[in-house]
């Protein structure tokens, strides 16, 4: 294989891998799993790491304090309107939020790397029924330390004791999310 052919092939592989990750067709595990015991499965209660306390200004200008929701299962989604997989995932999250409300499940978004007005337009377009904190500098993700999101979107389920019970890096599906939320909310 010529040098030019190797360069072209390497570039094509990199583009394909990036496309699969962006489309949510793969999720990251191992060392990129954020130091979590498992990604994509509900974590055993004894192995669940504490989630950081998160609060901030919502896209509508209010204040959201996630620790005030202790005792409830919380679904926390990192997203951005610029993120193509987030556009596909938004309606899924909205549907699961509506369908699990009777279980006392709370949903919140973390809108990253953009102006709040773009995030608010996204929420209106996709009828997102829950608040999102504006985080243009990605400061909230950093607070997760070793369990930081490895892709956009990333979704966490935090149990009623404030511990990370489930994580998914990339776009989640309705069946994945609904099953995990139900399992964590009804132990």
Each PLM stretch: what is its role?
Residues 36-38, 55-61, 138:
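Short gly/ser/thr-rich secondary-structure transition/capping motifs
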């Amino acid at each position: 294989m010529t040098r030019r052919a190797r360069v072209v092939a390497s570039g094509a592989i990199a583009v394909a891998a990036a496309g699969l990750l962006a489309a949510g067709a793969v999720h990251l595990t191992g060392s990129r799993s954020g130091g979590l015991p498992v990604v994509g499965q509900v974590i055993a209660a004894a192995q669940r790491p504490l989630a950081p306390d998160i609060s901030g200004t919502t896209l509508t200008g209010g204040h959201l304090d996630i620790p005030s929701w202790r005792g409830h299962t919380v679904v926390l989604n990192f997203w951005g309107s610029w993120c193509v997989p987030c556009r596909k995932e938004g309606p899924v999250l909205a549907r699961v939020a509506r369908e699990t409300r009777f279980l006392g499940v709370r949903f919140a978004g973390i809108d990253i790397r953009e102006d709040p007005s773009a995030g608010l337009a996204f929420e209106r377009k996709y009828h997102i029924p829950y608040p999102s904190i504006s985080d243009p500098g990605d400061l909230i993700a950093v607070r997760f330390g070793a369990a930081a999101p490895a892709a956009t979107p990333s979704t966490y389920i935090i149990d009623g004791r404030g511990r990370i019970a489930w994580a998914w890096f990339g776009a989640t599906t309705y069946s994945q999310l609904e099953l995990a939320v139900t399992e964590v909310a009804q132990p």
